[in-house]
């Protein structure tokens, strides 16, 4: 069964826009689990633009499912991850000027640093995922770095249309095959929404999709729980075909 990770970053974005105490990411996480989320994903960025350190520490002990903490490959973030001990840490690239994560982690270009981080987090009892582009060389490097999980960046597919979207989808399919060949758990995410999720969810071998912005946006109209249930239903329907 394919799993749905609910990214709560943009619940925190709404809060930070006015520097209020609401909406509370912890409440969003708990209610997401009630609605069927299989895990809760949150990105503690270096610039703290949405999720704050206090959120991470407050949410971790309250979850009944899993916490998937996204963070950059920096000493500060690795120290926080080891202190919090989430079930999973997904290492992602970060640029301060970006609106959202723009590309995958360059495992090849910083192999030693990635391998060291994987070893550190694994020693702390944390499963490590690397957020990478659907590229065979990067996947092979992730396997050599001893990461047990990869998350394929689906942004190029999400932004494409027509024939280009189909080509990007084929890249994802091929990347899944490479990941499985290397014994990796393969997840995916970025830019997925109600109109494009099923093509990705239908790919055998993908274990988990992490989705946030689209669900937060739909919740404005339908409510948080319904927005989550509807997304999960689309994923399950696609996988059952």
Curated annotation (Swiss-Prot):
The record marks 151 as: Transition state stabilizer. GO terms for cellular component: cytosol. Pathway: Cofactor biosynthesis; pyridoxine 5'-phosphate biosynthesis; pyridoxine 5'-phosphate from D-erythrose 4-phosphate: step 5/5. It comes from the Bacteria. It catalyses: 3-amino-2-oxopropyl phosphate + 1-deoxy-D-xylulose 5-phosphate = pyridoxine 5'-phosphate + phosphate + 2 H2O + H(+). It holds the Pfam family PdxJ. 3-amino-2-oxopropyl phosphate binds at residues 7, 18, 191, 212-213. Its EC number is 2.6.99.2. GO terms for biological process: pyridoxine biosynthetic process. 1-deoxy-D-xylulose 5-phosphate binds at residues 9-10, 45, 50, 100. It is found in: Cytoplasm. The keyword Cell inner membrane does not apply. One of its GO terms (molecular function) is pyridoxine 5'-phosphate synthase activity. Keywords: Cytoplasm, Pyridoxine biosynthesis, Transferase. It is an enzyme of class 2 (transferase). The active site is at residues 43, 70, 190. Homooctamer; tetramer of dimers. Catalyzes the complicated ring closure reaction between the two acyclic compounds 1-deoxy-D-xylulose-5-phosphate (DXP) and 3-amino-2-oxopropyl phosphate (1-amino-acetone-3-phosphate or AAP) to form pyridoxine 5'-phosphate (PNP) and inorganic phosphate. Belongs to the PNP synthase family. PANTHER family: PYRIDOXINE 5'-PHOSPHATE SYNTHASE. This is Pyridoxine 5'-phosphate synthase. The gene is pdxJ.
């Amino acid at each position: 069964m394919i799993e749905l990770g609910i990214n709560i970053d943009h619940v925190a974005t709404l809060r930070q826009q006015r520097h209020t105490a609401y909406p509370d990411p912890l409440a969003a996480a708990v209610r997401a689990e009630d609605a069927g989320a299989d895990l809760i994903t949150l990105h503690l960025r270096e610039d703290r633009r949405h999720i704050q350190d206090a959120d991470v520490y407050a949410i971790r002990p309250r979850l009944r499912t899993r916490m998937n903490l996204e963070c950059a490959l920096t000493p500060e973030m690795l120290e926080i991850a080891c202190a919090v001990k989430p079930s999973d840490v997904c290492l992602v690239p970060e640029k301060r000027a970006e609106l959202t994560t723009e590309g995958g982690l360059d495992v090849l270009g910083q192999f030693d640093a990635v391998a060291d981080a994987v070893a550190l987090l694994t020693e702390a009892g944390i499963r490590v995922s690397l957020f990478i582009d659907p590229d065979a060389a990067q996947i092979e490097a992730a396997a050599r770095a001893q990461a047990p999980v990869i998350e394929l960046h689906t942004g190029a597919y999400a932004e494409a249309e027509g024939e280009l979207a189909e080509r990007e989808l084929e890249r994802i399919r091929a990347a899944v095959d490479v990941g499985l060949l290397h014994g990796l758990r393969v997840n995916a995410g970025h830019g997925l929404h109600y109109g494009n999720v099923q093509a990705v969810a239908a790919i055998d071998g993908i274990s988990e999709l992490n989705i946030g912005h689209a669900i937060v946006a739909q919740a404005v109209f339908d409510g948080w729980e319904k927005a989550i249930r509807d997304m999960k239903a689309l994923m399950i329907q696609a996988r059952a075909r």
